[in-house]
Structures are given as structure tokens and as C-alpha cells.
């Protein structure tokens, strides 16, 4: 799956706690290295969207000022 595919899956989730549960599940079940990298990128992107108040950004377009709030 691509980063966009994972991001669309993660956008169905509106809380950081639920996002972490899905992230842990996928991290445990995925075996392909490229899928894992794409999933990590999408999860980080969704974390940034959630801490910015739910504002949606295109892949790779999250402002640098938002990243300081992502844990």
C-alpha cells in the first residue's frame, strides 16, 4: 500500500489513542519493509493532523511549525 492508502485508513480515526492502537496492530502484522515505511510516514502525518486540530494536509505538506507538537 502507498502512504496515501494508509493515510486514508488513518483518517477514519479521530483520536491519538485509537491511532496508536491501529498503528501497533499494523506494525505487528506487516512484513514488507516498504509497507512498514509507508505506514510509519502516514501515521506520523496523521498525528500531525490531529495535533493541529484536525486540519488535513496533503502528503508531505505539513507545516514545520506543527511538527514540534507531535510526540
Curated annotation (Swiss-Prot):
Pfam families: HHA. It comes from Salmonella choleraesuis (strain SC-B67). The keyword Calcium does not apply. The record marks 44 as: Interacts with H-NS. Forms complexes with both H-NS and StpA. Disulfide bonds: none annotated. NCBIfam families: PRK10391.1 (NF007703). Keywords: DNA-binding, Transcription, Transcription regulation. Transmembrane segments: none annotated. GO terms for molecular function: DNA binding. InterPro entries: Hemolysn_expr_modulating_HHA, HHA_sf. This is Transcription modulator YdgT. Belongs to the Hha/YmoA/Cnu family. Binds to H-NS and modified the range of genes it silences; H-NS alonge silences core gene while the H-NS-Hha complex (and presumably also H-NS-YdgT) silences genes acquired by horizontal gene transfer. Plays a role silencing virulence factors in the absence of factors that induce pathogenicity. The complex formed with H-NS binds to the specific 26-bp cnb site in the origin of replication oriC. It comes from the Bacteria. Coiled coil: none annotated.
Amino acid at each position: 500500500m502507498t502512504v496515501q492508502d494508509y493515510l486514508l485508513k488513518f483518517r477514519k480515526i479521530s483520536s491519538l489513542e485509537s491511532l496508536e492502537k491501529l498503528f501497533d496492530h499494523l506494525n505487528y502484522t506487516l512484513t514488507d519493509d516498504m509497507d512498514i515505511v509507508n505506514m510509519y510516514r502516514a501515521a506520523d502525518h496523521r498525528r500531525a493532523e490531529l495535533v493541529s486540530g484536525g486540519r488535513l494536509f496533503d502528503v508531505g505538506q505539513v507545516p514545520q511549525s506543527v511538527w514540534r507538537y507531535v510526540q
